[in-house]
Amino acid sequence: MSDSPASPAPLHAQIDWDDQGLPHSRHYDDVYFSREQGIEETHYVFLEQNRLRERFAALAPHECLTIGETGFGTGLNFYCAWQCFAEHAPAEARLQVISVEKFPLTHIDLERAARLWPSLAAFSQPLLAQYVAVHPGFQHFSFDGGRVTLTLLIGDVLEQLPTLDARIDAWFLDGFAPAKNPDMWTPALFEQMARLSAPGTTLGTFTTTGWVRRALMAAGFTLRKVPGLGKKWEIMGGTFTGLPVDGVSSAPDAPWYRRPPAASGPRRALVIGAGLAGSATARSLANRGWQVEVLERHAEVAQEASGNPQGVLYLKLSAHGTALSRLILTGFGYTRRWLTNLQRGRDWDACGVLQLAFDAQEAARQAKLADAFDPSLLTAVSRERAEAIAGVTLPAGGLFYPEGGWVHPPALCQAQITHPRIQVRPHHQVLRLARVDGLWQAWDGDHLLASAPVVVLAGAADVRLFDGCADLPLKRIRGQITRLPATEDSQALGTVLCAEGYVAPPRAGEHTVGASFDFHSQDLTPTAQEHQGNLELLREISEDLHARLTRDGASSDSLQGRAAFRCTSPDYLPIVGPLADRAAFDERYAVLRKDARQVPDLPCPWLEGLYVNSGHGSRGLITAPLCGELVAAWVTGEPLPVPREVAQACHPNRFALRTLIRGEPAARRR
């Protein structure tokens, strides 16, 4: 995918509240819902026309119904759909709602709107509790133990829907009236709805405008008019019957990025590795009704890179819409919502992150970011303002990320992996996998440890021990952190400070300072030399804070810390998704060596049931939880929680593809 400048960050909805306490869009000069019959209209137009009550009741165990919506607005339709699902669906069924919103409400406005419907408080309050870090792109929410998910696509509907990889069962064709918002109600929108639908997909909409009706029919929907409610004479329901012969259909994905068949049979999986990636993957599968065994070679979870006392929720973004930047924005929001399950102050803290403009090049980079993103995500601050935020003297101003902070990674791992359908098996080191009678067997030498139809490799660079991953260009980078006892003076630090290194406010009486980068050493014994290097990184961040933390004159020989390996890929994107047989891949797509424009229509030789979640580098706190959801979506055939282009940019097959196109031999790395 080619990188292009990011669209300006969408502003929040500009709302006026009338004398009755109802919201009115200033931008569209239109109401969000009927003044007289808001809830009744939602039930009639969207729930009844899509027959949701009956369809929810008919769902099989673990079956998922997916709703697509154009215009999230105040969330009323979502609350009503969730309520209907909760009242009528079997206990093990699931609901996914995917909703586009160009101008999301602020938390204050969303909360004010929710107070209008006290009968829906059981459904609005969980959303309000998680309604943080809602920024452009895909924003993924999980409720009721993962039984209900919401993915908000923040941005213009004609930019967002083309990036969605999903199959929609029911459409809420909502939004401001066509006369007020003509840019949305276009044939291009209806063509995207058709692309995402299957025969039998239903829709409900309040509009019966003639050109809307004709454009929907041209896209493959059969429509019916039905009497409306109140002042609305008529509304429409419909069913997708298939694209007409001359309909517009999008080109299919290249075979190496198409989905493998969704897993069938027993819902059992093995996850190898109990760090951030493994625990997140296990939880995402367990939330979908899978029994998961986590095989961990250590005595406890989070013993390698995920075991540091503090990690930073820091967004290293691009001012352009790169795949990595989009992944970071989506992952940051998902992690921040996950953290609401943990104890603030002990397990994490939203104290913000201040990235110092430590030289002219960094200052120029930050200026571009400040122009590209909304101030709710990041804002440029002067040196004086930065010092007021930090509570210590600083050499420069920088960018402040108010929603950032620090996390105790072992606490996040433990929270993710604690689930009745997850069993952690410590001291289980998997050395070999074998596929026998439709099951993957995990072996430790001659000892069979466990077996299941699905295996997810989440052991950082050690995934290269196994077929399907042996050729992945993962590299290990040693990093060492230093733990400094907090002093009375250092307690003033009010935010995470970052430059070439970082320092966090105290947790459990200690600051974490880091981290070194060593591309050569394979020894994880902490060294005095690297402790001294971390102290120098601290000095560059703040001479003042350095003095406050080192006044007792402790030598670097006596300092405490730990070292671990980061695992990263050449393009700095994680490696997430289904794995293919590399030899068969090279043979099947060998024509690419001669002509990269060829796209052979040959199915990818998948290693059935084998997946990977690795290569998160120093961004695991932001990317690993979301990528657990991405793996689960690949496994189950559900909608992907990230844009299709981002999922492909993270796909394991990207490296085999590049090797073929460049005519390079595959280099197995063991």
Spell out what each predicted region is:
Residues 111-162:
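S-adenosyl-L-methionine
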Residues 121-124, 319-320, 345-355, 383-418, ...:
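Helix-loop-beta segment of a Rossmann-like dinucleotide-binding subdomain
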Residues 267-293:
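N-terminal Rossmann-like FAD-binding beta1-loop-alpha1 element of flavoenzymes
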Residues 287-306:
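Glycine-rich FAD pyrophosphate-binding loop
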Residues 311-389:
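Dinucleotide-binding Rossmann-like beta1-alpha1 core, especially the glycine-rich loop
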Residues 399-445, 450, 454, 458:
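Helical element adjacent to the flavin cofactor pocket in flavoenzyme catalytic cores
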Residues 436, 443-444, 448-536, 540-561:
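Flavin-dependent oxidoreductases
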Residues 549-670:
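C-terminal catalytic lobe of FAD-dependent flavoproteins
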